[in-house]
Regions:
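An N-terminal amphipathic alpha-helical segment
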Residues: 1-25
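A generic structural signal for short, solvent-exposed coil/turn residues
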Residues: 22, 44-46, 55-57
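C-terminal edge-of-domain segments
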Residues: 49-71
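Amphipathic alpha-helical interaction surfaces in cytosolic regulatory modules
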Residues: 11-19, 35-50
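Residues that cap or initiate secondary-structure elements
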Residues: 9, 36, 69-71
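Intrinsically disordered, low-complexity sequence elements enriched in Ser/Thr/Gly/Pro
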Residues: 4-7, 42, 60-62
């Protein structure tokens, strides 16, 4: 699943990222133009079994989240 948050306000992006992290996903990509999101994601997934890979491409961030264990 790929979620593009670039057209949302920062507060709406934060809500959506929280929803995604708290959901039962196997793999998802988040595209954002807000650096604040990039700083918050690692803190939010610290105690969860989620791998994170971030790339800066074409003036936006792409964050790939992968669940380490699939139930």
């Amino acid at each position: 699943m790929e979620v593009d948050l670039r057209k949302l306000k920062l507060s709406d992006q934060l809500k959506k990222v929280n929803e995604i992290i708290d959901s039962d996903f196997i793999e998802t990509s988040i595209i954002t133009n807000e650096e604040a999101i990039i700083k918050i994601i690692p803190m939010q997934i610290l105690n969860k079994k989620i791998k994170c890979k971030m790339k800066f491409i074409d003036d936006c961030w792409k964050v790939n989240l992968v669940a380490k264990e699939v139930a």
